[in-house]
């Protein structure tokens, strides 16, 4: 029976029930709904709705129900209940009879689902933080293994300047650390308890909402009942944080897909994260990375979905808000599997150092060093930039690197060039000069890695 049937003289149509019921989605909140109900039983006992004996019977029955449904979603889904709240209440009544009908006193499904969802977000958010930390550790381990491998750095997907592979790894460590910080902030804002605010105007029973919040592990109760039952900022924020993190995952995946390509050949991926072709027997496809890149779009879609759902809703609760969960659940599922898969890919990744070094030595990646050399000799940078551009054009026409030019040839472009120019054109020199904080000089990369390893 529906929880709201007394007002109606006709049964809902089968189509409406199919359209309206949310159990196929919100069954995932069963643990939170039961935990919240256990806390609510204690709260209404303190204001005289239940006796202590009744409270204990209800709480025991709820704990039994939680044990029965853990790992058994089929039991919930087969019930035909409208939503997870209905399932829990109907199951409770089946266990303790009419006593179960007292539990909802002073409570609305509006504050109930808001509480369930925040509890779920807090729990799942902590699990995401663990996965982000594991990915960070995988990047640090890779940076340590391949710290001094030299590779070309890119702008516009054109070879630009040489960088250490460890520097590339630490760039993504920075990104994922920001993801951790963002999610931690979001979880702090979600750490307020909605329970006890009723449908929209607050509960009529003088309960201690601070104590209720504490019993559920929240930092504090919410302070405005209208806002409380209308608020889904935590859903939006977590989906937004996930979207930013997925952007970082997708960018890393794209880098690695390119590095793994036949055209680059910079890295090899383990067989366990790749697949083959049904037609072409030679293929080894980076499917794990491509799926990370692909799943990013669906996470973005869920963020846009919840923003669009919420953008014009009047206070307080509206049924539109039932649509908040499917996207959120999919976001968290997609994000978590992508974090796990990315860490697995990194753990088995091997750098082909000969190929990365050869690529770094091509494409005139030492051109900036020649310009800096001219500046050190007294030439204004803008003039030096122009001179080196002319040198590069000539080098391309002769199909040889800058360091292979005879001194006389280089002096034909700038007479201040001397024999010591060749010292600055080596890959080693290119790296070593980037010794300012945040640069790719190996001592800087080693220092940055050491600092990251200390920071947990």
Swiss-Prot record:
Keywords: Amino-acid biosynthesis, Arginine biosynthesis, Cytoplasm, Lyase
GO cellular component: cytosol
Intrachain S-S bonds: none
EC number: 4.3.2.1
InterPro entries with a match to the protein in the record: Arg_succ_lyase_C, Argininosuccinate_lyase, Fumarase/histidase_N, Fumarate_lyase_CS, Fumarate_lyase_fam, Fumarate_lyase_N, L-Aspartase-like
Signal peptide: none
Compartment annotation: Cytoplasm
Pathway: Amino-acid biosynthesis; L-arginine biosynthesis; L-arginine from L-ornithine and carbamoyl phosphate: step 3/3
Gene Ontology process terms (BP): arginine biosynthetic process via ornithine; L-arginine biosynthetic process
UniProt cross-references to Gene3D superfamilies, sorted A to Z: Fumarase/aspartase (C-terminal domain) (1.10.40.30), Fumarase/aspartase (Central domain) (1.20.200.10), Fumarase/aspartase (N-terminal domain) (1.10.275.10)
GO molecular-function term, one example from the UniProt record: argininosuccinate lyase activity
PROSITE patterns documented for this protein: FUMARATE_LYASES
Catalytic activity line of the entry: 2-(N(omega)-L-arginino)succinate = fumarate + L-arginine
PANTHER family named among the record's database cross-references: ARGININOSUCCINATE LYASE
Entry similarity comment: Belongs to the lyase 1 family. Argininosuccinate lyase subfamily.
Protein name according to UniProt: Argininosuccinate lyase
């Amino acid at each position: 029976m529906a929880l709201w049937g007394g007002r109606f003289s006709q049964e809902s149509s089968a189509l409406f029930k199919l359209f309206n019921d949310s159990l196929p989605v919100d069954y995932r909140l069963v643990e939170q709904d039961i935990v919240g109900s256990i806390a609510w039983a204690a709260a209404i006992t303190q204001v005289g709705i239940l006796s202590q004996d009744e409270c204990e019977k209800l709480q025991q029955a709820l704990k039994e129900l939680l044990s029965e449904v853990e790992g058994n979603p089929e039991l919930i889904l087969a019930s035909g209940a409208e939503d997870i709240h209905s399932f829990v209440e109907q199951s409770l009544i089946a266990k303790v009879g009419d006593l179960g009908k007292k539990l909802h006193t002073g409570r609305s499904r509006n504050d109930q689902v808001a509480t369930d969802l925040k509890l779920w977000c807090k729990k799942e958010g902590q699990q995401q933080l663990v996965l982000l930390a594991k990915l960070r550790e995988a990047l640090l381990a890779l940076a340590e293994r391949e710290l001094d491998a030299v590779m070309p750095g890119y702008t516009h997907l054109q070879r630009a300047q040489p960088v250490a592979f460890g520097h590339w790894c630490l760039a993504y460590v920075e990104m994922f650390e920001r993801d951790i910080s963002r999610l931690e902030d979001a979880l702090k804002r979600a750490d307020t308890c909605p329970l006890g605010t009723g449908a929209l105007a607050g509960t009529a029973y003088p309960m201690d909402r601070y104590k209720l919040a504490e019993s559920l592990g929240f930092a504090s109760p919410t302070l405005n009942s209208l806002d409380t039952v209308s608020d889904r900022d935590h859903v939006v924020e977590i989906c937004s944080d996930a979207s930013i993190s997925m952007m970082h995952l997708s960018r890393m995946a794209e880098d690695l897909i390119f590095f793994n390509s036949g055209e680059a050949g910079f890295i090899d991926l383990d067989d366990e994260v790749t697949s083959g072709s049904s037609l072409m027997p030679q293929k080894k496809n980076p499917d794990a990375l491509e799926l990370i890149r692909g799943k990013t779009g669906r996470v973005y879609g869920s963020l846009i979905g919840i923003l669009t759902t919420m953008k014009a809703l009047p206070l307080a609760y509206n049924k539109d808000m039932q649509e908040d969960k499917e996207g959120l659940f999919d976001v968290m599922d997609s994000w978590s599997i992508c974090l796990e898969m990315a860490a697995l890919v990194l753990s088995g990744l091997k750098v082909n150092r000969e190929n990365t070094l050869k690529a770094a030595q091509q494409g005139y990646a030492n051109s900036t060093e020649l310009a800096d050399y001219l500046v050190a000799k007294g030439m204004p940078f803008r003039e030096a930039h122009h001179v080196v551009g002319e040198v590069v054009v000539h080098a391309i026409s002769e199909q040889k690197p800058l360091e292979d030019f005879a001194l006389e040839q280089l002096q034909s472009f700038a007479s201040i060039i001397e024999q010591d120019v060749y010292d600055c054109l080596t890959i080693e020199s290119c790296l070593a000069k980037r010794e300012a904080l945040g640069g790719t000089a190996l001592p800087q990369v080693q220092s940055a890695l050491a600092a990251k390893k200390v920071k947990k």
